[in-house]
Amino acid sequence: MILSHLDLKIMTTTKKTTTKPRKPKSFTVKKQVSLDLPRNPFLFEVLDLVSKQRTKAKKIEVLKKYEELPLKVILIWNFDESVVSILPPGEVPYTGYNDQNVYKGGVSAKISEEVRSMHSQGNFSLGVSDGQGHTTIRRESKHFYRFIKGGDDGLNNLRRESMFINILEGLHPLEAEIVIACKDKKLGEIYKITKEIVAEAYPDIQWGDRS
């Protein structure tokens, strides 16, 4: 086959084009935080889950899902200005034993140290077997009235403080941290939760006039 001059010109000047395959568009799917917790969760687990929610509506949803009286008790203690703690503010003095060594200092500092250790180790195991807690806020909340004004004013202050320390020592460190925070109305410094959120989640709570 003889190619003409025109054919040759076309062949030498026409650029070969290739079609590149289109890459499929990628979509980022936001991973939603599960609202499911173990049966009878510790209250620090509930409050931690509340903190992880980015919207007010989701925080309220978590509070409604895990609604129970002990949770309301600590939230009222913390957020109701008419609830006045009659325990000394700030650090809680403590003297105890660790193996054969005597430990002297403050309960708050001791618990904070344990909490930091748990975070650094990534170990939040629970239960009596691991020494992280022998009781819960759920069980002990019935005694909290003794620590507020008008609850049990006839109780000797030394006895009251001793009871408070005993409860703290029996709790999981993260639950003890909650109780100490509520005593001084500082729960909001640990967990992202406000009185407004609590009030919307639990409209049955009557605020004020409790002392």
Name every feature range the model reports, one short phrase each.
Residues I2-S211:
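N-terminal nucleic-acid-engaging modules of covalent nucleotidyltransferase systems
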